């Protein structure tokens, strides 16, 4: 009966098309249907504002609506509009509809079962759950189905095999399980098959080898096991095969060598064994070959050198042996060669890099020997040279010290000798120079002090014999300088007045003499200072006790004299102090962490006493008093301490009485207490001048300053310590409480509380009980970056110049680089956006809101749901649900575009289904001047626009579609260094433009990326 009704309906629609009157009636009906569809949608950004009745209403011109020549709706494209709600059943009345796209929204409700026959359905990047809807005979004409990036589950049914017209099937990033249906063999027209990022199991079906039209097969990030079917070698049209990250095993079939069109082959992170098939060398079209993270054995086959189009070869983390085929240096397109963590031996090909645009060479943790080839940077593209943990001998090639593209040089733990070549300090992109654990001699080249880019220098465990260059510690970007275990002599340079970035200084185990310069206290970012095992004399400068970031101070095994500074125990951040085996005297202060310091960290000082050491004798006290005025202060301190204890006891009694009175009438009233929400526990990550009670007193509606996806934020003013805090009370569902997840969450927050970086909002503490959780962190005076850019707070008036915005971009990059590269395990934020970047009183950027962050103990980790914010989410996040640092880098790129354009990630002006990334890329494709995209409030003159365009290129690199093509955050920092604003007078503007134009292409030399689009 239903089929008859549909047939009659279609028949009358056809007859009606011959009559203008009936056509008009039909259009009115479709208009009503569209309004009915709109009525069940939630449209917070008002994208569908033109969907309304008016005297001139023509629904064919409405946003997202396309009609055929008869005036009937044939396409609905509502992608990227932030829509929620449900799709009305009335959509079934759009009988001419053939294409339906609601991707990148927030829909959760299932589609109506009465959806009309379609050729294209795109419901990707939503929150649909449940099983994939069943297909009726009316769906047999379906050509394009994209349901990626949802929460769909269940098994893939045999019904999918009935869609014989299907060309694109994209189900990536869901929770499908079970094995692949054998009916897939019926999909003879299928060109694209995307199933990655699910929980599919079983073996790969050999019937996939019967799909003659298949060009792209993305099946990785699943639980497939067993071997690769040799029948896969029959898919002659296959260009892209991704079977990465699974449980596949056995040998790689030699039949893959028959895939004459294949360009990308990804088999990394499986359990493949055996040797690399020599037949792989027959795939002359191959550009990307990644067999990393398996258990492959044997040698690298000589046939690999026949892959003349090969750009990337990654065989790292296997069990390969033997040497590198010498002819690999003849591959004219090779950009990336990663072989680290194998058992390879022999020498590197002597002309490696001579014929290829080599950008990235990593052969670390092998058994390579011989000399380092001098040709590695012949083409001028080498950015990363990583050779550590081998047995390379000879000298460091002088050609490397003139390689202007270098960003990282890591050669530690080899047998290199000779001196450090002069010239590394002149490489404007070089960030890391790691030469530790070799046999290098001579001195530290003086040009190192002139570097404008070096952030990490490690010359430890060598045989360097010289004094330190006087300005070595004043390198502007220097964060770590490590020269331990050498023969460095002379005094510690007294040139600390300009060390804005230095956080780690290790001069231990040398022969340094003289005193510790008091000017070292000017290094505001210094976290670790290690001067142990030297010949230092004099007293410990009391200025050290005021250093706001210093957490580790090791002065052991020297000849320091005098007393411990009284305030050293209450130093703002100090957590570890070792002054053992010196000549210190006098009582040990009993304040701060010195009350519980390990006595071993004080031993070897015969004159020290008191505190955690044995009590001071009268003789020691007299000696101490005679030798300095500190004795009087200590006696006064004891008297004041006794008085303070008495006063504190009285104050405690009074406070408890007053608090009980407040507690019965304030925030935590009797009702709350009766529900078990007491006691509150305060976990402190820093020394705090307030209590849980102080915080709770501020949690009231009048102090609320924000509300987000993770909780409510309150401003809390601590009158006792004149401190202003931000307190986030986290949302918690009843299920969370019943599941008892508090302990896990506390553990995670405890890890995050240990983060220390100037561009990360400091977590000061964590307040919790059985029902509620609150995170306490620094209050940022200038709010968040999103409001500043888009004009919602006063800080926006301070961001009208490019230098301020650039500095914010650089600060965020440093913060993310710390999370990704310096934390162990690394921290993936997962929700980088302008609203999660806070601005302090100096407009320095601080990354905030780790409500979605996860500590990544492994390189890849599955998450239970898509997190992040629309407009900032990386495209692969919807189909892999496996997160790594690349999703943060994409989001960072979007933030860069916000800073550059002054626009939000999603704006109606961009067009339907277009975000800011695509909006900019379209301008490039359409040859539209990119200056038009820049914020006119900032880029109002030519040289500023040129500087901004350099950063725009970095933003485009960060937002490339493929995660592997995105740079790391360390690369981003290097590129931003190239794009640093250079202010010149108007008379020099022409020269400025020319110099920037020359740098325009070099920005990309720090990342192996071929293009922007």
UniProtKB/Swiss-Prot annotation:
Q: Does the keyword Phosphoprotein apply?
A: yes
Record keywords: Nucleotide-binding included? yes
Post-translational modification Phosphothreonine, affected residues: 691, 710, 741-742, 862, 880, 992
Gene Ontology molecular function: ATP binding; protein kinase activity; protein serine kinase activity; protein serine/threonine kinase activity
Main location, first listed in the record: membrane
Phosphotyrosine: which positions carry it?
A: 777, 818, 872, 879
Which PANTHER family does the UniProt record give? Answer: LRR RECEPTOR-LIKE SERINE/THREONINE-PROTEIN KINASE-RELATED (PTHR48056), MDIS1-INTERACTING RECEPTOR LIKE KINASE 1 (PTHR48056:SF26)
Function, as annotated, reads: Involved in the regulation of procambium maintenance and polarity during vascular-tissue development. Involved in the pollen tube perception of the female signal. Phosphorylates MDSI1.
Name it: MDIS1-interacting receptor like kinase 1
Organism of origin is Arabidopsis thaliana
Higher taxonomy: Eukaryota, Viridiplantae, Streptophyta, Embryophyta, Tracheophyta
Question: What is the name of the gene encoding this protein?
Answer: MIK1
């Amino acid at each position: 009966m239903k089929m008859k009704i549909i047939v009659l309906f279609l028949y009358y629609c056809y007859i009606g098309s011959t009559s203008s009157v009936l056509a008009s009636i039909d259009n009115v009906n479709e208009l009503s249907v569209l309004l009915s569809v709109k009525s069940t949608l939630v449209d917070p950004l008002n994208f569908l504002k033109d969907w309304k009745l008016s005297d001139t209403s023509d629904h064919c011109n409405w946003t997202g609506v396309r009609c055929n020549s008869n005036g009937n709706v044939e396409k609905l494209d509502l992608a990227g509009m932030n829509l929620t709600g449900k799709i009305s059943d009335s959509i079934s009345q759009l009988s001419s509809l053939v294409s339906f796209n609601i991707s990148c929204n927030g829909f959760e409700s299932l589609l109506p079962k009465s959806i009309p026959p379609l050729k294209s359905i795109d419901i990707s990047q939503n929150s649909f759950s449940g099983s994939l809807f069943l297909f009726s005979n009316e769906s047999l004409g379906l050509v394009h189905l994209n349901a990626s990036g949802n929460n769909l589950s269940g098994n893939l049914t045999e019904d999918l095999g009935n869609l014989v017209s299907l060309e694109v099937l994209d189900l990536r990033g869901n929770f499908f399980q079970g094995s692949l249906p054998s009916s897939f063999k019926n999909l003879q027209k299928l060109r694209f098959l995307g199933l990655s990022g699910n929980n599919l199991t079983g073996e790969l079906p050999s019937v996939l080898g019967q799909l003659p039209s298949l060009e792209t097969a993305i099946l990785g990030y699943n639980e497939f096991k067993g071997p690769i079917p040799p029948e896969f070698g029959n898919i002659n049209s296959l260009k892209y095969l991704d079977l990465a990250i699974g449980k596949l095993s056995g040998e790689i079939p030699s039949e893959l060598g028959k895939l004459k069109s294949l360009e990308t082959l990804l088999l990394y992170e499986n359990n493949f064994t055996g040797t690399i098939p020599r037949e792989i060398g027959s795939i002359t079209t191959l550009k990307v070959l990644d067999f990393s993270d398996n258990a492959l054995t044997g040698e690298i086959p000589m046939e690999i050198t026949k892959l003349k189009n090969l750009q990337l070869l990654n065989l790292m983390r296997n069990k390969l042996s033997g040497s590198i085929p010498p002819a690999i240096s003849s591959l004219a397109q090779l950009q990336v060669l990663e072989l680290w963590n194998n058992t390879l031996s022999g020498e590197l090909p002597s002309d490696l890099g001579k014929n290829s645009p080599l950008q990235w060479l990593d052969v670390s943790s092998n058994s390579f020997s011989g000399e380092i080839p001098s040709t590695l940077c012949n083409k001028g593209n080498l950015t990363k040279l990583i050779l550590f943990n081998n047995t390379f001998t000879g000298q460091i090639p002088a050609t490397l010290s003139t390689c202007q593209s270098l960003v990282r040089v890591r050669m530690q733990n080899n047998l290199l000798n000779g001196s450090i070549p002069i010239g590394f300090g002149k490489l404007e992109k070089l960030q890391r120079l790691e030469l530790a654990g070799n046999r290098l001699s001579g001195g530290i080249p003086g040009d190192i002090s002139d570097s404008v880019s070096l952030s990490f220098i490690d010359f430890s465990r060598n045989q360097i014999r010289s004094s330190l260059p006087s300005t070595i510690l004043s390198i502007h970007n220097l964060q770590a300088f490590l020269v331990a275990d050498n023969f460095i002599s002379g005094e510690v340079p007294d040139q600390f007045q300009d060390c804005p970035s230095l956080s780690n200084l290790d001069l231990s185990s040398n022969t340094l003499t003289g005193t510790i310069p008091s000017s070292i206290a000017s290094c505001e970012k210094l976290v670790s200072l290690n001067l142990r095992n030297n010949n230092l004399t004099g007293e410990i400068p009391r200025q050290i006790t005021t250093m706001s970031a210093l957490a580790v101070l090791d002065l052991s095994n020297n000849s320091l004299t005098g007393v411990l500074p009284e305030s050293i125990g209450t130093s703002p951040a100090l957590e570890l102090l070792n002054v053992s085996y010196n000549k210190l005297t006098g009582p040990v202060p009993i304040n701060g962490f010195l009350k519980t310091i390990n006595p071993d960290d004080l031993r070897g000082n015969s004159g020290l006493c008191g505190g955690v050491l044995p009590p001071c004798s009268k003789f020691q006290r007299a000696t101490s008093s005679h030798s300095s005025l500190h004795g009087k202060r200590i006696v006064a301190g004891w008297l004041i301490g006794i008085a303070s204890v008495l006063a504190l006891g009285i104050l405690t009694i009074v406070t408890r009485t007053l608090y009980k009175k407040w507690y019965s009438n304030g925030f935590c009233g009797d009702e709350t207490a009766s529900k078990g929400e007491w006691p509150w526990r305060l976990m402190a990550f820093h020394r705090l001048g307030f209590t849980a009670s102080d915080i709770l007193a501020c949690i009231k509606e009048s102090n609320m300053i924000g509300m987000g996806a993770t909780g409510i934020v309150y401003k809390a003013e601590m009158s006792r310590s004149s401190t202003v805090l931000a307190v986030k009370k986290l949302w918690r569902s009843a299920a969370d409480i019943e599941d008892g997840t508090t302990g896990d969450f506390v553990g995670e927050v405890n890890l995050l509380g240990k983060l220390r970086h100037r561009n990360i909002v400091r977590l000061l503490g964590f307040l919790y009980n059985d029902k509620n959780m609150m995170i306490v962190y620094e209050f940022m005076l200038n709010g968040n970056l999103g409001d500043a850019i888009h004009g919602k707070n006063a800080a926006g008036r301070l961001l009208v110049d490019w230098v301020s915005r650039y500095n914010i971009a650089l600060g965020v990059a440093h913060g993310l680089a710390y999370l990704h590269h310096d934390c162990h395990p690394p921290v993936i934020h997962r929700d980088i956006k302008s609203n999660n970047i806070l601005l302090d009183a100096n407009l320095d950027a601080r990354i905030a809101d780790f409500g979605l962050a996860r500590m990544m103990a492994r390189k890849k980790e599955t998450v239970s749901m898509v997190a992040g914010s629309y407009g900032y989410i990386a495209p692969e996040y919807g189909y892999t649900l496996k997160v790594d640092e690349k999703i943060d880098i994409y989001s960072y790129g979007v933030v860069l575009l916000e800073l550059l354009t002054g626009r939000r990630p999603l704006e109606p002006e961009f067009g339907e289904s277009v975000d800011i990334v695509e909006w900019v890329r379209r301008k490039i494709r359409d040859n539209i001047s990119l200056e038009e995209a820049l914020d006119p409030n900032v880029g109002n003159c030519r040289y500023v626009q040129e500087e901004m365009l350099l950063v725009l290129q970095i933003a485009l690199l960060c937002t490339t579609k493929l995660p592997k093509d995105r740079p790391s955050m360390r690369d981003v920092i290097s590129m931003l260094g190239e794009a640093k604003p250079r202010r010149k007078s108007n008379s020099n503007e022409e020269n400025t433009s020319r110099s920037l134009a020359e740098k325009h292409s070099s920005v990309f030399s720090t990342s192996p990326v071929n293009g922007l689009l």
